[in-house]
Amino acid sequence: MGQSPNGCSINNQQGVEFHQGKILFGDKYLKQSDMFTDAPTKLATPNSLLLCVRAPVGVVNITQREICIGRGLCSLKPNAAINLDYAYHALTTYQSDFESKSTGSTFKAISGSIIRNEVFALPPLQEQYRIVTKIEEIFAQLDAIEASL
């Protein structure tokens, strides 16, 4: 789970890139921020999944670089038995589940225990690669159809 650095350490010139929510989430990969901190508190390493834990709950992205994450994000680092792209696609299917488990009156949020207690299907690594290949093939076809409309 993220932890926001001291507000005095936030700047737009130097330090570790800082993200506190999904505002710079791309379709799949995190976009560059112009906010930095010279006192990072919680780091997400390259090739980690970023999960929004505050409204909107359950949105997923991948960071390709080290960043500092605030309280609105959770970083998940797949191990060697988990294909990053498979984990990304699998986690996106849980958004409505995370939303249904969120609590809060001002804005919805999920806790670390909700994430830790979630059960994910984990096929063998080679099957994960086959699943990702098929998903990307289908998405490419959908993109082509959409472009032709």
Kindly label every feature range from the protein language model.
Residues 97, 114-149:
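Amphipathic alpha-helical coiled-coil/heptad-repeat segments
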Residues 1-26, 39:
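Low-complexity, Lys/Gly-biased intrinsically disordered segments
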Residues 3, 26-28, 58-60, 140:
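Flexible loop/turn segments at secondary-structure boundaries
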